[in-house]
């Protein structure tokens, strides 16, 4: 098996090193990741300049682009052989609920949908790497198990791991996405030359975080697995929209 590993924290981030180490003796692993932190890049592609891959001393490939750029190139000729699976992470920080709309970690896994199989995105609920061994162990177990599972084509598994030692993890729960409250207003700043700017505020707290959601699972000490798909069609709105459209043109 050949696995393409990427992330949005950057090619030198501890999470991607831990993920590679966990999978290296299970599959033939290639790492293509951004040359800097690209958190919040979502599924953006770089279209205004050429992309220049550079192979680092450890064999990882650094790219001056987004997580989606990395996987796109990995699936389209940058690697000697196409991968069988895309695995993204391990992100330092949660990707829960609405986070998946902005997350470069999840976007890298979504780009892997073109392989037709299942991709996985892993996130640890901490900005610190102390419990990366827990997350890496769980990632290895899930990648191994997923290879024996027949899911619908183009499924992405979004995995969030509590910031706990392995012995304190209570198990795994299958969850739906919760929802966050609206984020605080951007923070206005003025530099020493008087030029105004803004910092985007941190994500809002869980607004829909009850039982069954990814928020609830991780807060109770469980690993959360949420199956995602690209199709965002709101089918329940079709009936009302059909009536609304009548006679417009």
UniProtKB/Swiss-Prot annotation:
It is found in: Cytoplasm. The keyword Nucleus does not apply. Keywords: Cytoplasm, Hydrolase, Metal-binding, Nucleotide-binding. Gene3D superfamilies: Survival protein SurE-like phosphatase/nucleotidase. The keyword NAD does not apply. Its EC number is 3.1.3.5. A divalent metal cation binds at residues 8-9, 39, 91. It catalyses: a ribonucleoside 5'-phosphate + H2O = a ribonucleoside + phosphate. Its cofactor is a divalent metal cation. Nucleotidase that shows phosphatase activity on nucleoside 5'-monophosphates. This is 5'-nucleotidase SurE. It comes from Pseudomonas putida (strain GB-1).
């Amino acid at each position: 098996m050949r696995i393409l590993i990427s992330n949005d924290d950057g090619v030198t981030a501890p999470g991607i090193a831990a993920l590679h180490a966990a999978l290296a003796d299970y599959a033939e692993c290639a790492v293509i990741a951004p040359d800097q932190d690209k958190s919040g890049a979502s599924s953006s592609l770089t279209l205004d300049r050429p992309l220049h891959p550079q192979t680092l001393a450890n064999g990882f490939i650094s790219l001056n682009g987004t997580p989606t750029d990395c996987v796109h190139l990995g699936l389209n000729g940058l690697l000697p052989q196409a991968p069988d699976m895309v695995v993204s992470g391990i992100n330092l920080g949660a990707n829960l609920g609405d986070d998946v709309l902005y997350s470069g970690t999840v976007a890298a896994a979504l780009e892997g949908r073109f392989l037709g199989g299942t991709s996985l995105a892993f996130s640890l609920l901490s900005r610190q790497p102390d419990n990366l061994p827990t997350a890496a162990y769980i990632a290895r177990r899930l990648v191994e198990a997923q290879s024996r599972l027949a899911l619908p084509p183009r499924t992405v598994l979004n995995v969030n791991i509590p910031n706990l030692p392995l012995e304190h993890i209570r198990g795994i729960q299958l969850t739906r996405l919760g929802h966050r409250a609206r984020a605080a207003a951007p923070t206005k700043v003025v530099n020493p030359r008087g030029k105004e700017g803004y910092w985007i505020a941190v994500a809002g707290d869980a607004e829909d975080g009850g039982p069954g959601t990814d928020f609830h699972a991780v807060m109770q000490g469980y690993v959360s697995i949420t199956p995602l798909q690209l199709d965002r069609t709101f089918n329940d709105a079709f009936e009302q929209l059909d009536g609304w459209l009548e006679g417009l043109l």
